[in-house]
Design a protein with these regions (language model features):
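C-terminal motif of bacterial Sec signal peptides marking the signal peptidase cleavage site
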Residues: 1-3
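Bacterial signal peptide processing site
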Residues: 5-7
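Short active-site neighborhood of thiol/selenol oxidoreductases, capturing the structured segment around
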Residues: 22-34
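Thiol-based oxidoreductase modules, predominantly thioredoxin-like and allied folds used
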Residues: 31, 50, 54-68
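The canonical Cys-X-X-Cys-His
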Residues: 36-39, 82
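Typically the conserved alpha-helix immediately C-terminal to a functionally engaged Cys/Sec
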Residues: 40-53
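Structural micro-motif
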Residues: 74-83
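Non-catalytic, surface beta->alpha helical segment in thiol-disulfide oxidoreductase systems
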Residues: 84-115
């Protein structure tokens, strides 16, 4: 008798991204890893952005060491890569490498002082 195939659970990162894209808020998703120096340098920038834009945008960080399956559907080739989604869920920008906080805020559709 053949063994039953193990049921694969969906990627938690993909589910998080999908949920955020359905909220009507702009979203940044960074695909990175704790083993990546630039990714580690981005951590405080993304944390500050999340705090500044709390309730107005989603900031999601996917650690590909923990959830590699999340990279596939987005064709991630470099770490870090940031993907920006408009409030309607459409992908509007993709950026490989590090980014400054003012640029992240601008890409999300806000001015630097979040007017």
């Amino acid at each position: 008798m053949a063994a039953c195939a193990e049921k694969l659970s969906p990627s938690p990162g993909l589910q998080l991204i999908e949920n955020a894209r359905q909220t009507g808020l702009p979203t940044i998703v960074e695909f990175g890893a704790t083993s990546c120096t630039t990714c580690r340098n981005m951590k405080p920038i993304l944390e500050a952005t999340a705090l500044e834009l709390q309730g107005r945008a989603h900031v999601i960080v996917i650690d590909l060491n923990q959830d590699y399956a999340a990279a596939g559907p987005f064709n991630i080739r470099m770490m870090p890569t940031q993907i920006f989604f408009a409030a309607d869920g459409r992908e509007i920008e993709r950026h490989p490498g590090g980014m400054a906080q003012p640029e992240i805020v601008r890409q999300l559709g806000f001015t630097e002082d979040c007017d």
